[in-house]
């Protein structure tokens, strides 16, 4: 594969290399270790270089889509703003919101002499910037995460097209134009709850975050550096044994990387020999990995 990071770095461009975060740095910063594939590193650098193209990330829930933005911001030393999408979210919310209720309340205070008319007339006081609005106004390049865009109304992605493409917008209430001082690095995640419009997809870069089967032991080790290789290997093997059974059984929800990490966090609390013995015959603490009763019946051996 062409090494885009190396090529861009040689030209003095900003690049993401996917450097591992040490356990010590993780504890200090609160940033979880993240081990990206080389393909994902390339996709991130495309988004950084092309500037006006957000990177759309798809993949199984729990595969690390959301954590990527955090890891990129940490490595590059850039601020991160996050916009968690809900079914009620509107595209304008990511730019700004206008607090009409507060202004009405303040107008009532003017009548009784507890607020000045000048303050109420200053509409800027009632404007709150959203994630994109904040990123546009930041004095340095900013990483923006738009999380789970597929939760919103079908028109939501298209309503963002102009602002993402032109890197500017106008506050309707004041007529004030806002233009990006530095183009943000935008990551958008989707769990495929609904299809996204073609017009929106054409303006995005796309990467599917694959389940990191070959990296699982390294991922666990990065999070639990004090644990032994023996325990990590045994836990990962048991986890993959379960996951392959779920794939064969066509389970709608397969155990994910994030659940593996939760599971291992519990396993390591016990004496190693005790857990190793348990792992030989069964799945300890299945509640962490199996989220439906049918899965418990299908993948666990219950005694009569």
Which residue stretches match the model-derived regions?
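C-terminal regulatory/interaction module of P-loop NTP-utilizing enzymes
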Residues: 1-304
């Amino acid at each position: 594969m062409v090494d885009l990071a190396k090529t861009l770095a040689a030209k003095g461009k900003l690049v993401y290399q996917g450097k591992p975060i040490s356990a010590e740095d993780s504890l200090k910063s609160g940033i979880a270790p993240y081990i990206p594939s080389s393909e994902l590193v390339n996709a991130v650098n495309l988004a950084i270089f092309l500037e006006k193209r957000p990177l759309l990330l798809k993949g199984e829930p729990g595969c690390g889509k959301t954590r990527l933005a955090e890891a990129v911001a940490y490595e590059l030393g850039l601020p991160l703003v996050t916009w968690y999408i809900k079914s009620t979210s509107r595209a304008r919310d990511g730019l700004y919101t206008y607090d009409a209720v507060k202004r009405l309340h303040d107008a009532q205070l003017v009548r009784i002499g507890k607020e000045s008319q000048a303050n109420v007339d200053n509409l800027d006081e009632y404007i709150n910037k959203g994630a994109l609005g904040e990123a546009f106004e930041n004095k340095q390049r900013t990483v923006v995460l738009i999380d789970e865009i597929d939760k919103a109304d079908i028109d939501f992605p298209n309503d963002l097209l102009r602002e993402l493409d032109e890197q500017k917008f106008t506050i309707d209430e004041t007529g004030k134009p806002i233009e990006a001082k530095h183009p943000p690095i935008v990551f958008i995640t989707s769990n495929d709850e609904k299809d996204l419009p073609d017009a929106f997809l054409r303006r995005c870069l796309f990467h599917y975050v694959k389940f990191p089967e070959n990296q699982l032991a390294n991922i666990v080790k990065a999070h639990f550096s004090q644990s032994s290789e023996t325990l990590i290997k045994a836990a990962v093997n048991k986890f993959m044994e379960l996951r392959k059974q779920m794939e064969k059984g066509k389970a709608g929800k397969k155990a994910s990387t994030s659940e593996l990490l939760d599971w291992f966090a519990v396993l390591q609390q016990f004496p190693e020999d005790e857990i190793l013995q348990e792992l030989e015959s069964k799945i300890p603490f299945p509640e962490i990995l199996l989220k439906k009763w049918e899965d418990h019946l299908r993948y666990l051996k219950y005694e009569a």
